[in-house]
UniProtKB/Swiss-Prot annotation:
This is Small ribosomal subunit protein bS16. One of its GO terms (cellular component) is cytoplasm. It comes from Thioalkalivibrio sulfidiphilus (strain HL-EbGR7). Pfam families: Ribosomal_S16. InterPro entries: Ribosomal_bS16, Ribosomal_bS16_CS, Ribosomal_bS16_dom_sf. The gene is rpsP. It comes from the Bacteria. Keywords: Ribonucleoprotein, Ribosomal protein. GO terms for molecular function: structural constituent of ribosome. NCBIfam families: S16. Signal peptide: none annotated. One of its GO terms (biological process) is translation.
Amino acid sequence: MVTIRLARGGAKKAPFYHIVVTDSRSPRDSGYIEQLGYFNPVARGQEVRLHMNQERIEHWVSKGAQTSERVGKLLADFRKQNQA
C-alpha cells in the first residue's frame, strides 16, 4: 500500500521532516516515490513551518494512497491556514 507520511531529516535535537509518498513496508527514511512538502516543527522567526503541494497530495489520495495520522492533521492545518 502507498502511504503519505513523514521522513525525518535535520540534526540531533533539531528535527526537520519531509512529507513523502512511499511504500508502507519501507523504513521511515529510506527511498520514496515523491516528495510533497516539508514540516519544520522548530521554525523560528520568518522560517516557513509547513509547506505542501496540495495538488499532488490530492492526486495521490485519489490514486488510493493513505495518509498517516500526523500528515492528516498537518494537511487539515495547512488547508485552514490557506483558507484564511
